Amino acid sequence: MQSVPFFNTIMTYHEILKTYWGYDNFRGIQEDIIRSIGSGHDTLGLMPTGGGKSITFQVPALAKEGICIVITPLIALMKDQVRNLRERGIKALAIYSGMTREEIVVALENCIFGDFKFLYISPERLGTEIFQTKLRRMNVSMICVDESHCISQWGYDFRPAYLQISEIRKMLPGVPVLALTATATPEVVEDIRRQLGFKEDSRTYQMSFERKNLAYIIRPTEDKEEELLHILRKTEGSAIVYTRNRRRTREVTELLTQQGITATFYHAGLNNDVKDQRQKSWIENEHRVMVATNAFGMGIDKPDVRIVIHMDMPDSPEAYFQEAGRAGRDGQKAFAVLLFGKRDKTTLDKRISDTFPEKDYIRDVYEHINYYFQMAMGDGLGCTFAFDLDEFCRNFKHFPVQADSALKILTRAGYLEYTDEQDNTSRLIFTLHRDELYRLQEYDADTEKLINVILRSYTGLFTDYANISEDTLAVRTGLTRQQVYDTLIMLTRRRILHYIPGRKTPYIIYTRERMEKDWIVLSREVYEDRRESYAKRIKAMTDYATDEETCRSRMLLHYFGEKDIADCGQCDVCVKKRKERASKPAPSLTLKERVIALLSQTPYPAIEVAKKLDADREEVDELLASLISEEIIRTNEGILSI
């Protein structure tokens, strides 16, 4: 394993790329972005899914002294990138919702004293006192804002926590910011620059979102399951099938399996070990099809996906473009197919009312949350609770979809912080020094075996928390999972290590003290403007699915602000037009065109022209007289020529 040279001033960007990633050259606009942020300019990079965004901040950060702060809402992605960086010998760590205060303190101290190059952090952690206190002591080289469209209230995935980034900028006024996104309309681009406080010398780089190898197809059907089977039988290669909910992932997987198509499913409700195993089996082509909710796909490295099929309509062109774009990253021919039925438009329209329930309903949900947690008036500020949405809805007679939406709106309004399910892996750190650990002679055989297996299986256990798997430790030690758990709890009580069992639960944090529900203010910016923007995206998605005259690729690119784009020639609309042109008989030539064509080949006697063309003699004579007078043809003793 390589270690990162301290302060890589002697390494060029290309040397860093070659040393740690093995590539000789950058792709597309990667180098432009790297040189811009490396020179200290605030920079915005717009790159399509699969465009290599991570390289644009990882390479310049390695060329600078200090640590790069990477802000991202995607916990699974930050864990994956931290793991990949560590495998390359690059010191990186992550702080996200669900970590204990002790874990966070250890991580932040490592950022100050441990020569780490990257700190990945979720936006919700930016406003905490402990982070801001420690941040002032860090040597920060640059800030990277991933998924930067989340800072814009006009974006399809606005997250209020992103607005705290502007406060971080005030604390680090000389530190440049790199904002990255794969989906942003022109309106959102301007909002990103404004919200992040970009300086006058800032720069923006944009790759075209056009995917020349990807054919977009709308398939109208009232029997989506049968159409899905038909498509998968007619095509070859790895596939992703997106469904709207978790239940459907299982149902579709069972259907495909029954029909002899190898498939597995994935959604946020599965535990990490199951997710990892299924993802691995799909990547290694043990299963041809991954059936998933939109929880799947971010950061997945599988370039040979040949087809992405949507069983249900996404909420926006942004979401569809990102998910469809997971096909054909290897540059080979690929397909993105959306199955569209008559009922889909009605379903989309209903999503508006489900996503933005009435304000009085939202206030009722707030009051019921307080009852659920038995929160007294004026109390609650800073309190965190594990939360079971299904139980809450059963107790207070709510529909889960609407209650979930109400809680998200209350989060945007600043009254609560509600997160979906967090699947946090078990972690541990040794609290004794390595020498002290070996001096202790009071372990039984099973405990000693477990400690030795842990030390052989994981690294960095004396300086940072490491993710562990009780199942893996059970296999390697020959103990049961329960024995592993009990032993780790015992070692924690004896202060030999600190073990945090994995847990999987959503949670709610009170960001303000409890108040009367009638005092809840849902501003136009939080509610009406967001609802209107959401409705526009729904309409844009419906227009995309129902327009039978405009090239699909051109429609998507136009939505993202790219003008004067040629038809792709491969979507269902373009193919249909090409077939229609091919099926039409060649238009018949006019009599004038036939006369000129005849005389262009050879001079001809005037009296023979009508007979040769099998045309009316009178009509031909009249036409010949006109062409002679216009000097289009010449006559010489009754012989006509051009």
Where in this protein do the model-derived segments appear?
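Short, Lys/Arg-enriched, disordered terminal segments
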Residues: 1-12, 582-590
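Helicase motor core with emphasis on the C-terminal RecA-like subdomain
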Residues: 3-20, 24, 28, 32-54, ...
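C-terminal accessory region of SF2 helicases/translocases
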Residues: 287, 305, 309, 313-322, ...
